[in-house]
């Protein structure tokens, strides 16, 4: 049984087809990169997996640990171990990071019939996890992401990931808006959280994040389909030759996809 | 109109009865003030929605009821255990308890006096020093309306708090007004007078609540004078029972370099009108008016504020928020006057409303009248629902849908509560708010 199995997934928003038959299998311990140009459907795929309600699945299925994922509410997916690192982390005035994370962690623990952590236990866990991502303690007591810099927001996502300890983490363009130092810190955090028991799906436009988070598999998403899969070297070829190279190589597929999209 | 005439006749009859019971006391300056108050009320009658200041708030149900002014103290079945839900634990401060508008010395708690501080019953203070009435109690000069006139007409008791020059009162003064009506609807009219001397500092907490489901009208007037360089925080928690009416008017005068903060929190009442009127009487003073109204069902909550920048170099900040559910209706009217001489005024007003249902509504109206040219005045109003992207973000971390909604609603509202500096009150308000926000709704029956 795979950790995640996406079968012939078709999805769209407001009647517009975006994903046109995605197939993807992720096993525990693996890192997968999903690369593609703007508008190819990368963030839609991440959103569908996390349960964004704006997206409508029209065909296909997604199995997570062998169970139907698409019937679950976003919070149920999170409690089952799925974590989406947002491309644009949301500011939540009036709710501190600490309060938010404690509520989230205890909701997850409760779902797993684990005892909820009290304030002291939670604080010691948080202190331990702060080291993973070199997270500034002063950000803990501030409202979630409010007034954070772009780098701080992305770091907060990975910090949350460290605390919530997901089985499947989906990083949606976590590299966007980061300078090279911040990128390295975020990537190192992700690497420290790797284990044989979890998996990471990295959604990105650029190859540079993959210098630091080295994927086992690279999938190229164009016009709603995975048109090519390979090892980490595929990312380097893409970096050199650009997405047009793939379009040229898999022209027939692209044409099909465009035709389907215009229906 | 007949109803209006009937209402006036009713209160005229009550006023005559009241005067007859006063005997010799009807010749005092205080009673002259009452007479002026009654004449003003009789001339105006209760307002109608034809009047601009009452356009969105109909007091017809209130004018149609013959309320009986409470003319003397009676314990009305209240005892010490009735105070517990309202008490601010751990403050160790003064607690002044009023039953249906009258001071209860038995239920109040006044720790041994400190120099420069006088607290207690306004009725007693006026008996001791009749000139007080002439010096301080004159709402008409500061834009009082028919309700303040009615309060003045039957003026008998309320809280009296005077803190002398340079004196700091560490613990808050808690003014607890409790009402209880049986079959007879009561008119409960406390009149509070708070005087902070030059450089004096204090916090006052007013709470209003009812016992039992009976119908009453609280028509409270609070007059506050902040001397030069003084600092007063005035927190008000309104939790009348859900069948009753509350009209509260707070009038504040600020001396030079004084600072005043009002935090007005509304949870209760069927029809509620709060007026907070602040007047700068000296330069370089600062006034902060905050408000939070949480309402549902058929509740109607109207907040009217006036900040009169009559002097130069003053600052005012205003933040009023509302969370409305069910068919609740909110009104916010924020007036800011900047007089011709009030150069370098800095005024900021914000009104934000969260609507949790399709039927809840808010009428919001900022009103800036600026006669000076070198000033900074801003205002803004937002009305909306919860941000679905925020809801999704919380859900994506494992927090349930309704918990996420309650959490975001709480965060929106507690922004105002966080501005209360009296710790015990702030904690109480947070707990009250938590109890009210459940299952994505506002719940008043707790």
Residue map of PLM features:
Chain A
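Short coil-to-beta microelement around the adenine-binding A-loop and adjacent beta1/P-loop entry
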Residues: 16-17, 76, 184
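Conserved structural motif at the start of ABC-family nucleotide-binding domains
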Residues: 4-6, 19-21
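The feature captures the beta-strand-to-loop junction immediately N-terminal to the Walker
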Residues: 35-37
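Walker B catalytic motif
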Residues: 170-174, 181
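Conserved beta-strand-loop-alpha-helix hinge in the C-terminal portion
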Residues: 217, 221, 225-248
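ABC ATPase NBD Q-loop/coupling interface
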Residues: 61-77, 145
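ABC-family P-loop ATPase nucleotide-binding domains
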Residues: 90-167
